[in-house]
Amino acid sequence: MSSLEAFPVLPVASNSGQAFRETTADGYSLGGFCWRHQVPDATRPLVIINAATSVRCSYYARFAQYLFAHGFEVITYDYRGIGESRPASMRHFKASWTDWGALDFEAMLQRAQRLFPGQPIDVVGHSFGGCAAGLAPSADQLRRLVTVGAQFAYWRDYAADSRWQLFGKWHVLMPLLTRVFGYFPGKRLGWLEDTPAGVVQDWSTPSAAYEQRPSARALVDLPFARVRARTLAISLSDDPFGTVAAIERLLGYFEASERSHLRIAPGDIDESRIGHFAFFHSRFQPRLWPIALHWLQQGQLAEGTPGRLISPGA
């Protein structure tokens, strides 16, 4: 097992990737970006980055460039209704969490297999993006999976000291405003991107099982069990969404995968705060990004990795 100290801090290129459009199975056009090396290599892994709910793919550009600098091909993209994939009007635009995984992420897998034939496919999923990784019909093609704060927002799993505040914000106020506007106007509130009503309905439904969320009820079966990727779930101890219970709830669906849950406290890396979003901030390139990088490269944790294992190799 190698050490995290073996990873040099490489300069991250300033390019934003090559823009592309990809059409889903139901005919929707998605926008995204691709970092591709000039010299083809059938053994070079491709990483698809699945964003958190209503977070633009541009948020992950620096992390994508970091992976590219370490030899990966990388795809980032926006789910339907978000960023590069936003429609002309958000009012009553139809999209759901299940659409984001079963149609949008699936379209990226199809693109990967078409343009990078035979190359290993890995995924990094942030928040709901980790859940989306298990919803695509072709998810059995994944080699390795890294999730960060990945869960599907069951309110009782929120951190006890902020549970009722989060419940009021995301499970009362958000759906109420969505009924008024026909979508959630997150941008004008400064909370997140504007969000389709169907996604809000999935998020705010207070059910402990994903199959009980509105958009999942029509699924004949859940594709999660098809995933056999070697999986690392990273959680942060000061993330009020990504509690141990929340992370383990989602991990339980990936029953055919070898799963490890690494929990990191800010103090483990001499920081006072990390939270739900900051893992992908470039200031954490030297201390957090190598954890994901090593897993993508080797399928295991490096010696000296900060944090503690909650469920190693479950």
Predicted features and spans:
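Short beta-strand/loop motif that positions the catalytic acidic residue
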Residues: 227, 233-235
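Short alpha-helix in the alpha/beta-hydrolase fold that links the catalytic acid
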Residues: 229, 242-253
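Active-site glycine-rich loops that stabilize anionic/oxyanionic intermediates
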Residues: 44, 49-55
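N-terminal cap/lid segment of alpha/beta-hydrolase-fold proteins
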Residues: 2-39
